[in-house]
């Protein structure tokens, strides 16, 4: 991707995050880039191209955060590191993360199918961490990994609405982790 195309995608992501995909026009993007509307079409075929590229960037960033987790780490540490990575992506790529969470519905056809598949694959990777924790007895034996993954992702995905610049995302992730996972660990009850 050329430098200009990358700048264009970043600017579109910023506007999509602020105004929504449908609230952003090609004219808005051109104005933000300081170019004529028609000149954008030398770089893109449609506004949806920019939405797709933003979505692709988001999917790649979230998957890369999971890829960085050491395979030999204990399962609960992997969950903590996944949460840290997710919040770090949100903090470092706020516009992209916002668009990835909110605007994916506006893609059409094969592009939508691809991004939905990437989102599902990410969710499955998170579920697998909880499944591993349960199977290794690091988490409760009756843990529903689907519910656990949805809870974690529901909390983490909305970070774009409240995360303040400069906040330590690892500290926030560790607090979330303590609240979420401590209730999922095994416990003993009196006989």
What is the predicted function of each stretch?
Residues 49, 88-128, 161:
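Short secondary-structure transition hinges
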Residues 60-63, 110-136, 146-150, 154:
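Amphipathic alpha-helical packing segments from all-alpha helical-bundle domains
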Residues 7, 11-49, 53:
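Helix-turn-helix
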Residues 77, 81, 114-118, 135-151, ...:
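All-alpha amphipathic helical-bundle segments outside canonical DNA-binding/catalytic cores
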Residues 53, 67-95, 145, 149-152:
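Hydrophobic alpha-helical connector segments
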Residues 85-88, 92, 124, 128-132, ...:
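C-terminal peripheral helix-coil segments that are non-catalytic and often amphipathic
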Residues 47, 54, 58, 62, ...:
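Hydrophobic/aromatic residues within well-ordered alpha-helical segments
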Residues 98-100, 138-142, 191:
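Short, hydrophobic secondary-structure boundary micro-motifs
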């Amino acid at each position: 991707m050329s430098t200009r195309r990358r700048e264009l995608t970043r600017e579109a992501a910023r506007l999509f995050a602020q105004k929504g995909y449908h609230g952003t026009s090609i004219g808005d993007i051109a104005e933000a880039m300081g170019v004529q509307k028609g000149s954008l079409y030398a770089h893109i075929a449609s506004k949806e191209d920019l939405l797709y590229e933003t979505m692709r960037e988001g999917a790649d960033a979230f998957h890369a955060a999971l890829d960085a987790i050491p395979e030999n780490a204990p399962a609960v540490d992997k969950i903590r590191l996944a949460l840290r990575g997710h919040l770090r992506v949100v903090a470092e790529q706020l516009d992209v993360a916002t668009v990835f969470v909110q605007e994916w519905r506006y893609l059409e056809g094969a592009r939508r199918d691809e991004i939905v598949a990437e989102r599902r694959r990410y969710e499955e990777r998170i579920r697998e961490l909880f499944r591993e924790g349960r199977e290794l007895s690091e988490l409760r034996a009756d843990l529903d990994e689907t519910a656990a993954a949805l809870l974690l992702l529901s909390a983490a995905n909305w970070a774009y609405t409240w995360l303040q610049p400069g906040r330590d995302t690892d500290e926030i992730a560790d607090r979330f982790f303590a609240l979420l996972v401590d209730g999922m660990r095994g416990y003993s009850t009196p006989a």
